[in-house]
Structures are given as structure tokens and as C-alpha cells.
């Protein structure tokens, strides 16, 4: 009873999560959006099944198909059958292909396993499903999966694949096998290489005419022997003897979900001879094949890998002004998970880059993780029917603006605070962008160093700053007063690298103000252009005012 209650709760939670992300569209808008995406997916289906080609990555197709189903459920439409091929000239399967139900996570897998025993795990090989029929020891028929009941006659094509045994003996002499035709790979590491659109490539080779030589790049992984030996070990041994060696090599007995998770992770990182998109867990005990029906297999489930890239909906476009005055564009996203990381924002880049991408709220973009886990945009995979893009702010900012606070300077001013508090500058631990915004909103800073005047009481009474952290923050602000002169000059935004500034041997504000352009130009990595920028910087009225203010605060190097 507890098991079924847990399953019911999981279903309700899943339904709630689906409904929680339903778009706020009018019925007319919903009909238009659903119709447009439906037509596009139908076109991709036609290309895939009739022409053997694919204009879209497998992962993108799968996720957009899921998005369409979600929209249809949200607005009361009938969900479509995913990847339903045409039935022209179809051949009946001796045993139906059941398909496999997907588990959302390890907890769901554990629930499914509780009432089952003698379980085995296999890689979920990424290719196209096929039925192999052997009669009197010879390959008699090969049938594509189709709709699970009927498929295309692929006998001629499969007979040209050298990796598929054309003759068998013993228990397999009169047998029906189900498996996956896949693209042979040498040392494919799924974690690093991804799916490489393997499914579409295999489908293309099987659908095209006159490509007998290229068919030898294919092989088959048998994952089911309906009405075969009762013991899995016997099945695997007979299949290996007949030439289906991969099945025995990549089928392991498992006892619990933790063990499956370890194998799943191992295969994700290992060099394999095929592309995979997860694992399949199956019970050795199966019903008689006459009871097999599409969508009704209770003896096996799949646990797919988290996609390397996720399709995410753009919720908003936001503009940020950095400390140098450059405007950058950020896309706010409906949350997606990438490698256990929740991604809600992605940096697009400059305004020009954003305009080149042509991204608007409501669009669907493909997001992955670049180096150090930073989200990046790979592609715009779908644009909404109604698109309204915000107007970027005027480009009135530069490297010498917004040292002092004003309404128009809000974003660049905050960026300057974040910069000066970073580890490489003043090293103010425990405060980031949100903390600076809270302090500025409450205490209305005059300039970027106004925080030096805050008292412990003011910090303690700042909304958004935890009282337990206020004392620590005040301590950090006081410690900053003892930072070296060069750190304070960096906080003021001098256009030099730290190495060049240290090489200058400048140790006082008055000395720095009297240094000539020729002096700066002789520093390592500092040409004439950079030297002129330093002169412009130190002669700026805001910079001079800040220098005088720091002198009044008796900051090292600024004293008269």
C-alpha cells in the first residue's frame, strides 16, 4: 500500500510540475503556437521516415516534442504520437515492440524495483529498433520498429550489415529477436561526445537507396529474445555463441538502484562501441510474447542520462551595465537542470550579439555548460509566434562613468561595487551583488567608497543583510582600510593590469598623479594607447574627487 501511495504522490507531483509551467496564453495564441510547432515536427517526421534525413538534432527533437505534448495538455488538445512513421507497405511484427517507460530519477527506479527480482541492466543504445526473425537457422526477415505492431521490411538492408549474423543454430535457429541497429563507434565517451545525432544517422543509412558499403558501419545490439530461455545467463550465452557478443558483454545483474546508478555513471564515462542515452533495467522473467503490446511493458524501464544540452524557454531579456560601461544582455530562463546544476540565466553577450541571435521572450533556446560550468547558448531552436523584444538602454556609459551614484547609473554603479569587493581587489568576503544592492538601496551611497562610513548599527538594520553577518561585514570593511595602495587604485578602475601597476612602483596618490604618459608607456604590456587611457583616467574629475575623499579617510598612500 505504501508503495502505491508513493507512486501516486510522484504522479501528482509530476502533474503539478507540468501544469506549473503552462504558458499564460490566450486560447487563440495557444492554438497558433501549438499548430506551428506541430507542423514543424510533422515536417521533421516526414524528412526522417520518408527521406532518411534529419534537419534537427535528436535531443532537440525529443525535447521540442515533449514541449509540444506539455502545451497540448495545458490547453486541452490531444497529445500527438511521437515519431509515428507511415505505414505504407508495413509488415506485421511476429512479436510486438513494447517500448520502454522512462524513470524520472533514482527514487522512481527504486519504487519500481521493490516488487521485482532477478533484475539486469543494459545500456540504452541509441539507434533504431529492429526485429530479426530467424527461420531454419537463417535470417528470414528484418522489420523496422514502426508503430510497434507493424514496420517496414528491412530484410535486404540488414542482410548487407556484416555485423549481423545471417545464420544461427541451436535454440536461435527459429527465433525472434528485438534489438537496436546502431552506428559503430570506437571508444565513444558519452559524457564528452554526446549523442552525435546517432539515431538520425542510422535512420538515414537504412532509408537511403544504394548505400550498401556504408551499411557496414552499422551493427546490432540485441536486447530481447521473446520466449527465449528462462534464465538470463542462458540467453546471454546462446546469443554470444551465435555472434551477438555485445549483449552478454554489456548486460549485468543488479540488486538495487545504487548499483544501477554506479553502472550508469560508469558507462556514461567509459569508452563504448556505441552511442547511448541511458540504461535499461529489465526483469529476467517476462510474459509470453503473445501478451506483448506497445506501451504495456511492466518488466522493463529506462533511466536516461541528463541531456548535455537542454531546451529552455526564454522568460525575459535583461540588460546589465558592467564596470567598464559595456552593456551586456542576459536571458532569464524557465529553470532547467544541466549536470545537477539549476540554470535560470544565460549570458548572451553584447547588444550586437543579442541582435544577431535574434532572441525574444517566449523563444526556445538550446543551453549547455561551457568550461567551469558556465551556461552558454548553443542555438535558437524555436521562435514564438508573437515576439516582442525590449529596447536596450542608450549606450551612454564608458570606463569613466558612474563612480558616483545616480538614477541612470544604477547598474554600472553596482557593477563597480561588485568589482571592488572581489578577491583580486579589496577582498570583501561575504558580500556579492545582492548584498551591495541591499546596502545601496537602504543607505543611498554617494560614491563607490561610501560603505566605509557605515556603522555596525546601520549594517545590522539593513533589510536583506542577515543580522548574524552584519558584524562580520563591518569587520571586512574595516580590514579593507589596511589594504595596499595598489589595491585601492585598482578599485578605482585604473586601466592597468595588476602586474603593470606593481611594476610601476607607485606607492602614493601624489606620485601617481605626477607620472607622465612616457612613464606609463614603459611599463610591461602597456603601449601608447593604454598609457593615454591612464592619463585620461587620473585627470578625470570623479577620480580626483575620490582620491581626495580617500585621503580624508586616511587610506594608505592617499594621505597628503
UniProtKB/Swiss-Prot annotation:
Any single biological process term in GO: DNA replication
Example GO molecular function: DNA ligase (NAD+) activity
Keywords: DNA damage, DNA repair, DNA replication, Ligase, NAD
Domain of life of the source: Bacteria
Entry's EC annotation: 6.5.1.2
Coiled coil: none
Catalytic activity: NAD(+) + (deoxyribonucleotide)n-3'-hydroxyl + 5'-phospho-(deoxyribonucleotide)m = (deoxyribonucleotide)n+m + AMP + beta-nicotinamide D-nucleotide
Matches recorded under InterPro entries: DNA_ligase_AS (IPR018239), DNA_ligase_B (IPR020923), DNA_ligase_CS (IPR033136), DNAligase_adenylation (IPR013839), DNAligase_N (IPR013840), NA-bd_OB-fold (IPR012340), NAD_dep_DNA_ligaseB (IPR050326), NAD_DNA_ligase_OB (IPR004150)
Broad enzyme group: ligase
PROSITE patterns found in the cross-reference section: DNA_LIGASE_N1, DNA_LIGASE_N2
Catalytic residues, chain numbering: 124
Family: Belongs to the NAD-dependent DNA ligase family. LigB subfamily.
Job description of the protein: Catalyzes the formation of phosphodiester linkages between 5'-phosphoryl and 3'-hydroxyl groups in double-stranded DNA using NAD as a coenzyme and as the energy source for the reaction.
UniProt name for this protein: DNA ligase B
Species of origin: Shigella sonnei (strain Ss046)
Lineage, top ranks: Bacteria, Pseudomonadati, Pseudomonadota, Gammaproteobacteria, Enterobacterales
Record gene name: ligB
Amino acid at each position: 500500500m505504501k508503495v502505491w501511495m508513493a507512486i501516486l504522490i510522484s504522479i501528482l507531483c509530476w502533474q503539478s510540475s507540468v501544469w506549473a509551467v503552462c504558458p499564460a496564453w490566450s486560447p487563440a495564441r495557444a492554438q497558433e503556437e501549438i499548430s506551428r510547432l506541430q507542423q514543424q515536427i510533422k515536417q521533421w517526421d516526414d524528412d526522417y521516415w520518408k527521406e532518411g534525413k534529419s534537419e534537427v538534432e535528436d535531443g532537440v527533437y525529443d525535447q521540442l516534442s515533449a514541449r509540444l505534448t506539455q502545451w497540448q495538455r495545458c490547453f486541452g488538445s490531444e497529445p500527438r504520437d511521437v515519431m509515428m512513421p507511415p505505414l505504407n507497405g508495413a509488415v506485421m511484427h511476429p512479436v510486438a515492440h513494447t517500448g520502454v517507460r522512462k524513470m524520472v530519477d533514482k527514487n522512481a527506479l527504486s519504487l519500481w524495483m521493490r516488487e521485482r527480482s532477478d533484475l539486469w541492466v543494459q545500456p540504452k543504445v541509441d539507434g533504431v529498433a529492429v526485429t530479426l526473425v530467424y527461420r531454419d537457422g537463417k535470417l528470414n526477415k528484418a522489420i523496422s520498429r514502426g508503430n510497434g505492431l507493424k514496420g517496414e521490411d528491412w530484410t535486404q538492408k540488414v542482410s548487407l550489415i556484416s555485423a549481423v549474423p545471417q545464420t544461427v543454430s541451436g535454440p536461435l535457429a527459429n527465433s525472434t529477436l528485438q534489438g537496436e541497429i546502431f552506428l559503430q563507434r570506437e571508444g565513444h565517451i558519452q559524457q564528452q561526445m554526446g549523442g552525435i545525432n546517432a539515431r538520425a544517422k542510422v535512420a538515414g543509412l537504412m532509408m537511403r537507396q544504394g548505400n550498401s558499403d556504408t551499411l557496414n558501419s552499422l551493427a546490432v545490439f540485441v536486447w530481447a529474445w521473446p520466449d527465449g530461455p528462462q534464465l538470463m545467463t542462458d540467453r546471454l550465452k546462446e546469443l554470444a555463441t551465435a555472434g551477438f557478443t555485445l549483449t552478454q558483454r554489456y548486460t549485468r545483474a543488479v540488486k538495487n538502484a545504487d548499483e544501477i546508478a554506479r553502472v550508469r555513471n560508469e558507462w556514461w564515462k567509459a569508452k563504448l562501441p556505441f552511442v547511448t542515452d541511458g540504461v535499461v533495467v529489465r526483469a529476467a522473467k517476462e510474459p509470453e510474447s503473445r501478451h506483448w503490446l506497445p506501451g504495456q511493458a511492466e518488466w522493463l524501464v529506462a533511466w536516461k542520462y541528463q541531456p548535455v544540452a537542454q531546451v529552455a524557454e526564454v522568460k525575459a531579456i535583461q540588460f546589465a551595465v558592467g564596470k567598464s560601461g559595456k552593456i551586456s544582455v542576459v536571458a532569464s530562463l524557465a529553470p532547467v537542470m544541466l549536470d545537477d546544476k539549476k540554470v535560470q540565466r544565460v549570458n548572451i553577450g553584447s547588444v550586437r550579439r543579442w541582435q544577431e541571435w535574434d532572441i525574444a521572450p517566449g523563444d526556445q533556446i538550446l543551453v549547455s555548460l561551457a568550461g567551469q560550468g558556465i551556461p552558454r547558448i548553443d542555438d535558437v531552436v524555436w521562435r514564438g509566434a508573437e515576439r516582442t523584444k525590449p529596447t536596450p538602454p542608450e549606450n551612454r556609459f564608458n570606463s569613466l562613468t558612474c563612480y558616483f551614484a545616480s538614477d541612470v547609473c544604477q547598474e554600472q554603479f553596482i557593477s563597480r561595487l561588485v568589482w571592488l569587493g572581489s578577491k583580486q581587489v579589496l577582498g570583501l568576503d561575504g558580500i556579492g551583488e545582492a548584498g551591495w544592492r541591499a546596502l545601496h538601496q537602504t543607505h543611498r551611497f554617494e560614491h563607490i567608497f561610501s560603505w566605509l562610513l557605515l556603522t555596525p548599527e546601520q549594517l545590522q538594520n539593513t533589510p536583506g543583510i542577515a543580522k548574524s553577518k552584519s558584524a562580520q561585514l563591518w569587520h571586512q570593511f574595516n580590514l579593507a582600510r589596511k589594504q595596499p595602495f595598489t589595491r585601492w587604485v585598482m578599485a578605482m578602475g585604473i586601466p592597468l593590469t595588476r602586474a603593470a601597476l606593481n611594476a610601476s612602483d607607485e606607492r602614493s596618490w601624489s606620485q601617481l598623479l605626477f607620472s607622465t604618459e612616457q612613464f606609463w608607456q614603459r611599463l610591461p604590456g602597456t603601449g601608447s594607447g593604454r598609457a593615454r587611457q591612464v592619463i585620461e583616467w587620473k585627470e578625470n574629475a570623479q577620480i580626483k574627487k575620490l582620491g581626495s575623499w580617500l585621503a580624508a579617510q586616511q587610506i594608505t598612500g592617499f594621505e597628503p
